[in-house]
Each structure stands twice: as structure tokens, then as C-alpha cells.
Amino acid sequence: MKKTSLNVVAAALALLALGAGATMALRFDVHKRKAPAATALFAQTFSDADGRMQPINQWQGGVLVVTFWATWCAPCIEEMPDLQEVQAEYATRGVTIVGVAIDNASAVKRFRDEQNIGLPLLIAGAAGTELIRQLGNPSGALPYTVLVGRS
């Protein structure tokens, strides 16, 4: 009798987990968001900290890691040296890490120069928050990292 009760509880938990997973998939529309999100990302052009315009699609075709960050975001600042190390380790494998700042150019340039950051740092300003939402972060919270594969 105990074995039957345990099986019923296990089956109920499995169904609950399946239902929760299906609800999350429908709520966040993960599969439908992939292609339009990548298209939206690669359609962007931002200036870098030196004022040069940089289209995101210049990195299309490789593995692209885009981290949305700001100089006023403590976790963002904390992860920047780690991202730079990852870039150095995986650059020969076609991986590029790009920082897109929800910030202003002077703050980003000062941070880059003081911290000796060699990653491409682009300036989206407040408009970048809408892009973050399109890429699957409805709250616009930072830091937010997006990984785009080769295809």
C-alpha cells in the first residue's frame, strides 16, 4: 500500500513539474522569441566609447556574447574582468564578448580607461532597455547577458 501511495505522489509531482514547465514556456514564449530577438540584436548600431559607430552585425557568424551593463551597476562592474578573461581565453575559437552600456559615453570611457578594459564597449543609453526587453528580459534588470550561436 505504501508503494502505491509513493507512486501516486511521484506521478502527481511529475505532472505538476510538467505543467509548470509548459506554463513557463508559453508565458515567456521562448521558441518564438529566438529568431526575431537575434534579428533585432543584429539590426542595432551603437557608438563605442570613442564615438565610432559599431554595427552589432559585424560580429555575426561567430559566437557572440553580449552583456548589457552600466557603470552604476555593481554586479556589472564586478563581472567585467571575468568577461575580459573569458574573451582572452576563447577569442581564437571565434568567441567575441561585447559590452552594451545602458549608460553615457563619458562614464563608459572613464571606466574603460581606469580599469583597462579591452572588450568592445558600446553605448546604448536608456534606449538599450527596450532592446533588453525584446531579448527576453522583461524587467530590464542589469547585468543581462545574451549568447548568440554561430547560426
PLM feature spans:
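Active-site acidic short loop of glycosyltransferases
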Residues: 59-62, 92, 118, 140
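Conserved hydrophobic/aromatic "anchor" residues
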Residues: 44, 68-69, 111, 119
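C-type cytochrome heme c attachment motif
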Residues: 71-78, 143-144
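Structural microenvironment flanking redox-active thiols in thiol-disulfide oxidoreductases
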Residues: 77-116, 126-133
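Short active-site neighborhood of thiol/selenol oxidoreductases, capturing the structured segment around
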Residues: 54-74, 83
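Thiol/disulfide oxidoreductase modules built on the thioredoxin-like
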Residues: 8, 111-119, 124-151
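N-terminal targeting signals for export/organelle localization
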Residues: 1-47
